Amino acid sequence: MAQVKRIRRNISGIILLDKPLGFTSNAALQKVRWLLNAEKAGHTGSLDPLATGVLPLCFGEATKFSQYLLDSDKGYETVMQMGQTTNTGDAEGEVLQTRDVTVGRADIEALLPRFRGPISQIPPMYSALKRDGQPLYKLARAGEVVEREARSVTINRLELLECEGTRARLSVGCSKGTYIRTLVEDIGEALGCGAYVAELRRTQAGPFALAQTVTLEELEQAHAEGGNEALDRFLMPSDSGLQDWPLVSLSEHSAFYWLHGQAVRAPDAPQFGMVRVQDHNARFIGIGEVSEDGRIAPRRLIRSE
C-alpha cells in the first residue's frame, strides 16, 4: 500500500526554543517542524550540541528575515574549565594538555578587560566554516589542520560571575561570528593554565531573551494534548526579531505600489536605514530601505498571513 504523503501546514512565525543539550540546531529544528507540521522552516545560526539556550526557529514567511537575526548580537553564559585544553575547545574533545592552575578570581578579573571591545579571533578547526567546500570540522576529524584567517569580533560584555577551584562562570555579550570556545581558550592561554568550555548556554539572540523561550518538552506536551495546532500559541509574529527597527506605515494606495516592487514615500520614514513596513491595517508587509531621495525601496516582502 502506497504511503500517503503528509500535507504540511503553511504557517508563519517564530518559536523561541530553549535548545536542549545534545541536539544539533538542525535536529532541534526538524523536531519542532514535525510537531508543528510546518511546510517551511529554518533556524538563525547554529548552536553546538554541547550548548543550550535561545534558538529562534523561523517558519513560513519568517524565514525571509532569519538572516537579520543571524547578524544580531548574542549573549552567553559559559563555564570555563581551567587547567586543560582539548582538541575541540570544549568538553567533548580529547584532552591535549594538562597544566597546574595557580590563578584565582582576582587574576581572572584583572585579565578580562584585555578581551573586551574589538578583538581578533582565529576560528577553531572544529567549526562549520568551509575550505574548498569542505567544513573545517570534517578536515579536523581527518587529522588535517589548515590555516585560518583571523577575524575581528566585538565583545560588548565580559564579566566573571563565579569562580570556584578550577572552574569559572563567565557572562559574555558579543557580535555575530564570535566563537566562545576560542574566547575561553585565549583567556586560558593568557592565564597560563589553558582552558576549555565545560558548559555553554545562549541567553540572548538579538532582541530575544532566555525568559521568552519554550522547551522541547513543553512543545511535545502541547502536541500530545492538542495536535499540531496546539503549538500555534507559541508562534511569535514574523517581524518579532526586528522590533528595534523603525516602523513605517503606508497608505492603502502606497502599500499597493510598494508590494508590487515600487519605491514609495511615507511621512514617518527616517532619513536612512532599514525599516519595518506595515499597511493601512497595521499589517506587517515586509522590510524596506530608505534611499537617498527619501523613498522606501522594498527589500523583502511577505505574503498575506
Swiss-Prot record:
Gene3D superfamilies: Pseudouridine synthase, PUA domain. It catalyses: uridine(55) in tRNA = pseudouridine(55) in tRNA. Keywords: Isomerase, tRNA processing. The active site is at 48 (nucleophile). GO terms for biological process: mRNA pseudouridine synthesis; tRNA pseudouridine synthesis. It comes from the Bacteria. GO terms for molecular function: RNA binding; tRNA pseudouridine(55) synthase activity. It is an enzyme of class 5 (isomerase). Responsible for synthesis of pseudouridine from uracil-55 in the psi GC loop of transfer RNAs. Belongs to the pseudouridine synthase TruB family. Type 1 subfamily. This is tRNA pseudouridine synthase B. It comes from Pseudomonas putida (strain ATCC 700007 / DSM 6899 / JCM 31910 / BCRC 17059 / LMG 24140 / F1).
